[in-house]
Design a protein with these regions (language model features):
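Single conserved position on a long alpha-helix in the C-terminal lobe of the eukaryotic protein kinase
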Residues: 53, 89-198, 259-262, 309, ...
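N-terminal Lys/Arg-rich, disordered targeting/topogenic segments
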Residues: 1-12
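N-terminal mature-domain "stem" immediately C-terminal to a signal peptide or N-terminal signal-anchor/transmembrane
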Residues: 32-71, 78, 374-379
Length: 380
């Protein structure tokens, strides 16, 4: 028969083990929760910047409407890139994350010595590493070895585009003048599992991105300076002073669009909301002047879904795009509309092309957004 005093002794011996197991379980659970709340891994690799964009292209391809787009007619340079690497942006790119570096005179921008905006990118997709490396060696002026990684220095229009193959499915690109920027990406790729990683601006505002968003952007808004940068020139009409914009898109039976515009104070947020409401009123006014589509149920549902709210120091804009409206937009696109491919990925510099890249004397939208990769021609 076991002595009565044996049970307390057994408990005392087991208690430290139980406590240790509970602590380990709690730590594992905390890491899982934190990783679930953290930005996508591709975005966490990006350097500190003034704006971020992430797109899950693998998900976007599941939309039935995209299968109805006209076929892409490739320009010779892009076709050569595809032939040499086997990589097709419109087919093989699964995720894309971009960091936008504003010039220093844009309120302490992160572009370093560059007087123009610069970009850093992470591409995730189905790469043939052997063919890709062979291509990069061919177009590089030099190759830097850094912590067992090769960084390919590609001269392009008076600047250097740096490319590093991080893994079998990930590639980093940057045209930032400081080579330490892409070296930092390489360093972060070695400790990617950390849910605490990523640029400060991204970490701070990612919590405002709705759950399950397949595309989002987080941008510092500098209205006065952005007026000189094509693609952002109209923002000064909406923002009275600097702000932060959190834009997102997610698909739940319809495409839900949301913009959270964080102002410096409640008064500025109210002004933003009032100006945005004026734009929405213009859209509603245009609803009756678009011909036969004016009575279309899907189009009407979209216009009716446009809403503007004001809450504290933020203005909130929301809209819901029905699947039918998406299909109508795609079906009604002109024959010379841009095709889904490298040119539709803003800021991309991974592929060589005949036109300038982002930040080169103007807007990324006006020039080939992929300096280094030829864009495909318009669909026919």
């Amino acid at each position: 028969m076991t002595p009565a005093f044996a049970d307390p002794m057994r408990i005392r011996r087991s208690l430290p083990i139980l406590i240790t197991l509970l602590v380990i379980a709690a730590a594992v659970a905390a890491v899982i929760v934190l990783r679930g709340q953290a930005p996508p891994e591709a975005a966490r690799l990006l350097p500190g910047a003034d704006g971020f964009l992430y797109v899950n292209l693998k998900w976007i391809r599941t939309l039935n409407g995209l299968s109805k787009l006209p076929p892409v007619s490739r320009e010779p340079e892009y076709q050569k890139f595809v032939d040499e690497t086997g990589f097709e942006f419109e087919r093989d790119l699964d995720e894309a994350a971009f960091a936008m570096h504003y010039p220093e005179n844009w309120g302490q921008g992160t572009a370093g010595s560059s007087p123009e905006a610069r970009f850093s990118e992470i591409f995730v997709g189905k790469f043939d590493s052997t063919r890709l490396v062979s291509y990069l060696k061919k177009i590089s002026a030099s190759v830097e070895s850094y912590r067992d990684f090769d960084i390919y220095n590609i001269p392009l229009e008076g600047r250097t585009v740096r490319v590093a193959v991080l893994s079998y499915d990930s590639v980093a690109v940057s045209n930032h003048p400081d080579p330490a920027v892409i070296r930092g990406v390489v360093d972060r790729s070695r400790k990617l599992a950390s849910p605490f990683g990523g640029p400060a601006l991204l970490r701070r505002f990612y919590r405002q991105v709705p759950l399950a968003s397949e595309a989002f952007a987080i941008l510092r808004v500098r209205p006065a300076e952005m007026n000189s940068f094509s693609g952002f020139s109209g923002w000064g009409l909406l923002f009275p002073r600097p702000a932060v914009a959190v834009l997102s898109a997610r698909y739940i039976h319809a495409l839900h669009l949301r913009a959270d515009l964080f102002a410096e104070n409640e008064a500025d947020a109210k002004v933003i909301a009032e100006r945005a409401s004026a734009y929405v009123d213009i859209f509603h006014g245009a609803e009756g002047s678009i011909g036969v589509h004016g009575t279309d149920a899907d189009v009407k549902a979209f216009f009716d879904s446009l809403k503007v709210e004001h809450s504290g120091d933020r203005a909130i804009l929301t809209a819901k795009v029905p699947p039918g409206f998406i299909n109508k937009i795609l079906a009604g696109a002109p024959a010379n509309a841009a095709a889904p491919g490298p040119q539709s990925v803003p800021g991309s510099q991974f592929v060589p092309g005949p036109q300038s890249g982002p930040g080169a004397q103007g807007a990324p939208a006006q020039k080939n957004p992929a300096p280094g990769i030829p864009k495909p021609a318009a669909p026919h």
